[in-house]
Amino acid sequence: MTNIRKTHPIMKIINHTFIDLPAPSNFSAWWNFGSLLGICLILQIMTGLFLAMHYTADTTSAFSSVTHICRDVNYGWMIRYMHANGASMFFICLFIHIGRGMYYGSYLLLETWNIGIILLFTTMATAFMGYVLPWGQMSFWGATVITNLLSAIPYIGTDLVQWIWGGFSVDKATLTRFFAFHFILPFMITALAMVHLLFLHETGSNNPTGINSDSDKIPFHPYYTMKDIMGFMMMFMTLLTLVLFSPDMLGDPDNYTPANPLNTPPHIKPEWYFLFAYAILRSIPNKLGGVLALVLSILILITLPMTHTAKQRSMMFRPMSQCMFWILVANLITLTWIGGQPVEPPFILIGQLASLSYFTIILIMMPLINLLENKLMKW
């Protein structure tokens, strides 16, 4: 009798995706993060569902309902902090996953890469709307500042902002629609992730060497399932340590003050995972210019396949490109730090220099160094 996993219509899909999938034999630990993102997504949907059971999307009771979850619901505090810090883990995995793609030239799988960029935008939108829901000071003012950026769009800007707000300021209508979108978007992310996997399995995975690995494949299960479980355990330990010992480490104390439209916090800033883009936004004195730079700081990922001038796919054997890559990582860490600092000297200048070097490294330095390496290797 033929094995059911190879004949049953649904089991067959699961089998070809997670069990009998031919995978390169030389995956490093950097290839763990795709599956970790899947686990993060499941965790966020589950904890989010339980939070939604007790949450009230109304300006008068949203803050109280979150307090009620933390005080009165059984393990409500844990569900809430798992969800909040789970988002941080999600973005850590996301940034490493993208960094891995940049380092090893995975962006040459065009469809997979482009769906990934759409996934990144959708995840950022979901996280932003989730941050508004507790209706604390930073929720309210973050929503006001970020949505207000759309008013920089010529001609339709002001109307667009008021249409998104559902009124003349961030209010009950805004909170209700943000809750609705925050609930539906993770399911869209799940669907997009499936398309992401579909396109990946059309071409097969890249590997650390960047060389075609058709001649040397191993089944995904048990080799990489075991390797992934190791990754899950490490991630869960990190997440639980964060949740149980310092759940508010990555949050903002201002969000424990109920939203007050009459009192502006001294420093309005988003969650840590948006700070690099926020720093780029603030480094340009012009409003429209800042908004464009903000969008381009993510959209720039689309240009990577076009600016890939190297003869080798991976950076594994290209020390100069490796050096440039780690300078880019250091640059992003600097931008993240600047995004959390007040707008005053010397932070303004550091932010402007870091923003300029971010775009320069990706658009100019990387392609030039690739060409130089080609020359040095006589290719």
Curated annotation (Swiss-Prot):
Tell me which UniProt keywords the record has, alphabetically: Electron transport, Heme, Iron, Membrane, Metal-binding, Mitochondrion, Mitochondrion inner membrane, Respiratory chain, Transmembrane, Transmembrane helix, Transport, Ubiquinone
Q: Where does heme b b566 bind?
A: H97, H196
What transmembrane ranges does the database entry give?
Answer: 33-53, 77-98, 113-133, 178-198, 226-246, 288-308, 320-340, 347-367
Q: What is its main location?
A: mitochondrion
Where in or outside the cell it occurs: the entry states: Mitochondrion inner membrane
Q: Reply yes or no: does the keyword rRNA processing apply.
A: no
**Co-factor binding details:** Binds 2 heme b groups non-covalently.
Provide the Gene Ontology terms for cellular component. mitochondrial inner membrane; respiratory chain complex III
Question: Which parts of the sequence bind heme b b562?
Answer: H83, H182
Q: Name one GO molecular function term.
A: ubiquinol-cytochrome-c reductase activity
Identify the InterPro entries for this entry.
Cyt_b/b6_C, Cyt_b/b6_C_sf, Cyt_b/b6_N, Cytb/b6-like_sf, Cytochrome_b, Cytochrome_b_C_euk/bac, Cytochrome_b_N_euk/bac, Di-haem_cyt_TM
Annotated residues for binding of a ubiquinone: H201
Q: Which SUPFAM superfamilies match?
A: a domain/subunit of cytochrome bc1 complex (Ubiquinol-cytochrome c reductase), Transmembrane di-heme cytochromes
Q: Does the keyword Cell inner membrane apply?
A: no
Topological category with respect to the lipid bilayer: Multi-pass membrane protein
**Cofactor(s) of this protein:** heme b
Q: Which GO terms describe its biological process?
A: mitochondrial electron transport, ubiquinol to cytochrome c
- Assembly description: The cytochrome bc1 complex contains 11 subunits: 3 respiratory subunits (MT-CYB, CYC1 and UQCRFS1), 2 core proteins (UQCRC1 and UQCRC2) and 6 low-molecular weight proteins (UQCRH/QCR6, UQCRB/QCR7, UQCRQ/QCR8, UQCR10/QCR9, UQCR11/QCR10 and a cleavage product of UQCRFS1). This cytochrome bc1 complex then forms a dimer.
Q: What does this protein do?
A: Component of the ubiquinol-cytochrome c reductase complex (complex III or cytochrome b-c1 complex) that is part of the mitochondrial respiratory chain. The b-c1 complex mediates electron transfer from ubiquinol to cytochrome c. Contributes to the generation of a proton gradient across the mitochondrial membrane that is then used for ATP synthesis.
The Swiss-Prot or TrEMBL record describes its family as follows: Belongs to the cytochrome b family.
As a miscellaneous remark, the entry gives:
Heme 1 (or BL or b562) is low-potential and absorbs at about 562 nm, and heme 2 (or BH or b566) is high-potential and absorbs at about 566 nm.
Report the protein name in the record: Cytochrome b
Organismal lineage: Eukaryota, Metazoa, Chordata, Craniata, Vertebrata
